[in-house]
Amino acid sequence: MSYVLFATLGLLPSFAWLLFFLREDIHPEPKKLIAKVFFYGALVTVVATGFQFLFRYGLGLVAIGQYAFVSFLIFGTIEEVLKFAVAYKAVSKSSYFDEPVDAMIYMIAAGLGFAVVENIFVMFSIEALGVALGVIVLRFVGATLLHALSSALVGYYWALSLIKARKKELIIGLASASLLHALFNYLIMKTGNAMFYPVIFLIIVAFFVFWDFEQMKTRSE
């Protein structure tokens, strides 16, 4: 197995979605700042994994049976809070962070950075190239898109919280993104890893998130 090839496959879904959203930005953000947030998002994956390990094994909380949804909700919350934390740390005081849509763009960059590490780990667990290609396509429309959408949702409410100068919207955004994360993973578990229903679910969510994105673009004109 070529680790370089499989690592490249792991990078592609995140880069593709990032390019898509960046092309939609009316006033493009500095590439160095986008790269910084993307890197921070990737780096925080290690922290999230540590917290999830603590909850799963240290507290005996496992994502099976009657506790499955609660487990997924806790794990999703950990990821969404950490992605927001690194994006906030990286850009909140930057002079380039000056438009409502910027909050969504930078959150998407953090989310896709997070997703790229997950994808590479998954690729390294596969030996056959044909299988890896099939899996990465599914992750492009599945887990990677999930991270983009959930992070965009946080970014939308982050922007609203800044516009309205109150924290309630940000809390709503983090809660909504965590719930989205949990519902997606729960659907996968319930459908026996069949991706049809989870992907349809994400497509429906995407319509609403893209509408939010257009709203913030309008506010940024």
Residue spans for each PLM region:
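Hydrophobic alpha-helical segments at protein termini of multi-pass membrane proteins
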Residues: 1-221
